[in-house]
Amino acid sequence: GTAHRAQGSVVGPAAYLPAVAGFLLEKEVDTLTGIFAEPERPFVAIVGGSKVSSKIGVLDHLIDSADTLIIGGGMAYTFFLAQGLSVGQSLKEEDWVERAGEMLKKAEEKGVKILLPIDNRVADHFGEDAVPEVVASDAIPDDREGMDIGPKTEELYAEAVKGAKTVFWNGPMGVFEFDNFA
């Protein structure tokens, strides 16, 4: 669907006409409501993207409903900071580190398994021509930034999904805009 896009053809008419959800949006909402209300178990949720702050509500809800929560993308580095790891020049939200730590604790208390990357593709700069290097999550150099999950993490995440009866996925695991990290 396109409801999330801020393009003139999507948002323009709604400013001048009565607006309602279309059939596709209604179907998506019904599907998600069903998934979260009574998921077939095991329920594995995968959340990626760049910022914890933009997904905080989703993450909180998933800790209450998922059996396993897989975290990737730029938001993983904020969780690494909450665990006391160094993240080099990686994207991070310093203001959300404490909240990320609280979410890790909440998941542990509820018996929800949290999977974070165990290795990462890093680079010396953010750009299309950046050359990936693979490093362990606890060994990100100070002059490198995380751009994607690494090959061991890909295997770990694939294994976690294999036995799932329900999988919910929202957001990318890396900088998909650059071919070397897509």
Feature locations, PLM:
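Active-site loop-to-helix "anion-binding N-cap" substructures in soluble metabolic enzymes
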Residues: 1-182
